[in-house]
């Protein structure tokens, strides 16, 4: 929820989507503690939300994605990022307006080059920048925790 709060504090109109109500409640509480208002909260699977937004023709100037590596749906449906990543990229590419941006981080072991390949396949003319997310160990070594990509349309 930190990205949603940062975007709102910078003046953006924000829609925060998460399938887990507790995450929405926690982020809403942080919004209130920060003195912010006006975030649109949607408790729903992000893929279902994106499919509907594409059908409605809704567009966004930016999309920030922080998908889980895996999860269980309300009926114990198993979800793995690797199985849905292509659809996520395709749907997001349809809801971001020209001149918009996408920021996506993953923690599934996908290297940055794989993220870049997927986004470039769907948006070949977009500008991309990708890298590794790391934590610095006490001995100074960097420990990889995930990947990040920024896409500008």
Language-model regions, residue ranges each:
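Active-site-proximal loop/short-helix segments
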Residues: 1-4, 23, 65, 69-71
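Hydrophobic/aromatic anchor residues within beta-strands of the central parallel beta-sheet
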Residues: 14, 38-41, 130
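Conserved SAM-binding loop of SAM-dependent methyltransferases across substrates and taxa
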Residues: 2-14
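Hydrophobic/aromatic beta-strand patches that form the interior of the parallel beta-sheet core
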Residues: 15-17, 42, 103
């Amino acid at each position: 929820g930190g990205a949603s709060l940062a975007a709102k504090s910078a003046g953006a109109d924000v829609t925060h989507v998460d399938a887990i109500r507790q995450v929405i409640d926690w982020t809403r509480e942080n919004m209130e503690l920060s003195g912010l208002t006006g975030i649109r909260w949607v408790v729903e699977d992000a893929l279902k939300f994106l499919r509907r937004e594409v059908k409605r023709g809704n567009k966004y100037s930016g999309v920030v994605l922080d998908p889980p590596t895996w999860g269980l749906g309300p009926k114990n449906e198993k979800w793995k990022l690797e199985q849905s990543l292509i659809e996520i990229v395709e749907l997001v590419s349809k809801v971001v307006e020209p001149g918009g941006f996408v920021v996506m981080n993953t923690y599934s072991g996908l290297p940055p080059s794989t993220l870049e390949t997927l986004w470039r396949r769907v948006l070949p003319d977009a500008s991309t920048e990708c890298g590794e997310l790391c934590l610095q160990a006490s001995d100074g070594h960097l420990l990889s925790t995930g990947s990040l990509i920024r896409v500008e349309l």
